[in-house]
């Protein structure tokens, strides 16, 4: 099948995370099907190094993610850990940080707006 794509999660090629128009230190991604050109739809794997923090942003559409490795903490103190599936509704605002690093499978439906 020419329209099938298989991604080997153990052998990804990560690039600096620049989804907000600037490179965010300590964050990198491997785009699977995600594209800003198609309205921010698709999937990517996000890698955050120890001590990394995402920019404060608002979700214009749903964002869902599955924690593959490590832990991620939101400003309210909620910790997402390996095996957690998290959903953010449109209009939600947050930033996240990781103490020891993490790997996250992200499903996007809309472009996040930096705040």
Predicted region positions:
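Short beta-strand segments in beta-sandwich/barrel cores
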Residues: 53-54, 70-74, 85, 112
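Ligand-binding loop in jelly-roll beta-barrel domains
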Residues: 90-115
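Short acidic-glycine-tyrosine-enriched beta hairpin
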Residues: 74-93
